[in-house]
Amino acid sequence: MKDSPQVTVLRLGHRPGRDERMTTHVGLTARALGADKVVLANAARNQADTVIDITDRFGGPFDVASTEEPKRLIRDFEGRVVHLTMYGEPVQEVEADVREANTAEPLLVVVGAEKVPFEVYEHADWNVGVTNQPHSEVASLAVFLDRLFEGRELDREWENPDRVVVPQETGKRVVDPDEE
């Protein structure tokens, strides 16, 4: 988000045939809730295209990249690393420290898909759990980003959209930005 060092979300792993929607939703959630970039495993090319298409239609800025070496990205990242895992420290106990670190350094938020290698736990500055119960990695990412940005992401202004959603009490309304 503006006024702070970059926040990048890394989708660690992607199981074709099993993770299509979940990987897409990790990217869309990262975009909608304040991250600056998502990095997906190369096997997730279609999911990357979907996130790029949404960004083109509904505004940005938001970057999408892919990697064949996600563990190397974690190891070589120049900033702090947060790994979202149900086994981590409770988000409410570490969020202030993570937020403070992100005032000075970029942040890489790692979201797993398949079994996460132990070295990811070791390289993370924080292993963070949202409830320490099994649930969706998309839910964990959403809660974590909301805690990180303290709700500021909900008021974000999107640049250069082709379409704008007009909030309604009932019904749906999507318009050209000039009609808003």
From Swiss-Prot:
- InterPro entries attached here? Alpha/beta_knot_MTases, tRNA_m1G_MTases_N, tRNA_mtfrase_aTrm56
- What's its EC? 2.1.1.206
Statement: the UniProt record of this protein carries the keyword Aminoacyl-tRNA synthetase: no
Query: What is the annotated localization of this protein?
Result: Cytoplasm
> What's one GO-annotated cellular component?
cytoplasm
Q: Which domain of life is it from?
A: Archaea
Q: Which residues bind S-adenosyl-L-methionine?
A: 84, 112-116
For the biological process aspect of GO, one term held by this record is: tRNA nucleoside ribose methylation
One short Pfam name that applies is Trm56
Name the chemical reaction catalysed here: cytidine(56) in tRNA + S-adenosyl-L-methionine = 2'-O-methylcytidine(56) in tRNA + S-adenosyl-L-homocysteine + H(+)
What is the uppermost EC class here?
A: transferase
Q: Which UniProt keywords apply?
A: Cytoplasm, Methyltransferase, S-adenosyl-L-methionine, Transferase, tRNA processing
Question: Which GO-annotated molecular functions does the record name?
Answer: tRNA (cytidine(56)-2'-O)-methyltransferase activity
Assembly information from the UniProt record: Homodimer.
The record's family statement is: Belongs to the aTrm56 family.
User: What job does the chain carry out?
Assistant: Specifically catalyzes the AdoMet-dependent 2'-O-ribose methylation of cytidine at position 56 in tRNAs.
Tell me which PANTHER family the record gives: TRNA (CYTIDINE(56)-2'-O)-METHYLTRANSFERASE
> What name appears for this protein in its UniProt entry?
tRNA (cytidine(56)-2'-O)-methyltransferase
* Species name: Haloarcula marismortui (strain ATCC 43049 / DSM 3752 / JCM 8966 / VKM B-1809) (Halobacterium marismortui)
